[in-house]
Design a protein with these regions (language model features):
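C-terminal helical subdomain
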Residues: 199-202, 207, 218-267
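Catalytic Tyr-X3-Lys loop
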Residues: 117-136, 155, 179
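Residue(s) in the substrate-gating loop at a strand-loop-helix junction
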Residues: 159
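Conserved mid-core segment of classical short-chain dehydrogenase/reductases
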Residues: 87, 110-125, 168-171
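Conserved glycine-rich cofactor-binding loop
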Residues: 31-32
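Active-site helix of classical SDR
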Residues: 139, 175
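Active-site-adjacent segment of SDR/Rossmann-fold oxidoreductases
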Residues: 164, 185-195
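Conserved glycine-rich Rossmann-like NAD(P)H-binding loop of the short-chain dehydrogenase/reductase
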Residues: 45-61
Length: 267
């Protein structure tokens, strides 16, 4: 049966999904930036992609690109802030494949950029949901198609903010620190079922997140000028270059490396 590039989040469509011929990699935040670059790199290396993003328009464009390289690649529109969306996406993935080669938990937001005293509580919680809770929720729901006879490799995208406190970034720092520990816990618990998990800090990448940082102000973010200067000085790294550096770890890290945190600048 023919399969449309984009899947709507409705269970009624599941009966029409043919199984993928090759094991896919699931990439969240795959519609742009680093996630899109990682997904394309994986497709070019011969892996079908299940690309996830909340931006349906950008995801459609990215998905067409991936499908041109690997015909089995598909897209699923899913907002990781919405737990019902996550549940529906997981069901669609399980209907599409009996085993996942890997998951790249790339989706993330930097907002809100505000002090702990002044930040909107709902926005702070939304950051934690997308950057951390959504990772656990999606992975938990996909456990039936992870590991087993073959190793499933899970990669989380870390940040220097996971290691140090940054004024104005409390939600992001907390979420990324939690994500590093989540990867360690996943590695510990997944070992007996051939599931590995690592975290990788990609450095300062030229993405929309950097634009969001530069659109903030010094009152909310004391390090504002530092990031403006990094952009002016051409210090931001192209996502395609970073994706190429991360690729071997994403697809080839060993069970012995599971639980480790890597920094792209040290690879």
């Amino acid at each position: 049966l023919a399969f449309p590039l984009a899947i709507n989040n409705t269970k009624s469509r599941l009966q029409y999904l043919p199984l993928m011929l090759k094991a896919p990699y699931v990439v969240t935040g795959a519609s742009r930036g680093l996630g899109r670059a990682i997904a394309r790199n994986l497709a070019e290396c011969g892996h079908p992609i299940i690309a996830i993003s909340r931006d349906a328009v950008s995801l459609g464009l990215a998905g067409a690109e991936f499908a041109d390289i690997q015909a089995d690649s598909i897209t699923i529109t899913c907002d990781l802030a919405d737990r019902a969306d996550i549940a529906a996406a997981a069901e669609q993935i399980k209907a599409k494949t009996g085993w996942i080669a890997g998951i790249i938990h790339n989706a993330g937001i930097i907002s809100p950029i505000k002090s702990i005293a002044e930040v909107d509580r709902a926005n702070w919680a939304r950051n934690i949901q997308i950057n951390l809770v959504g990772v656990q929720d999606l992975t938990n729901r996909l456990m039936p198609v992870l590991g087993g006879e073959k190793q499933t490799r899970i990669t989380t995208i870390s940040s220097g903010a996971s290691l140090r406190a940054i004024s104005g970034w409390s939600a992001y720092c907390v979420a990324k620190a939690g994500l590093d520990m989540w990867a360690k816990c996943m590695a510990e618990e997944g070992a007996e079922n051939n599931i590995s998990a690592i975290s990788i800090a990609p450095g300062i990448v030229d993405t929309d997140m950097q634009k969001t940082i530069r659109s903030s102000n010094e009152d909310d973010f004391p390090d504002y000028e530092t990031f403006v200067e990094l952009h002016k000085d051409g210090q931001l790294v192209n996502p395609k270059l970073v994706a190429g550096q991360l690729g071997p770890l994403i697809t080839g890290h060993s069970m012995e490396q599971s639980g480790m945190r890597f920094d792209v600048r040290e690879l």
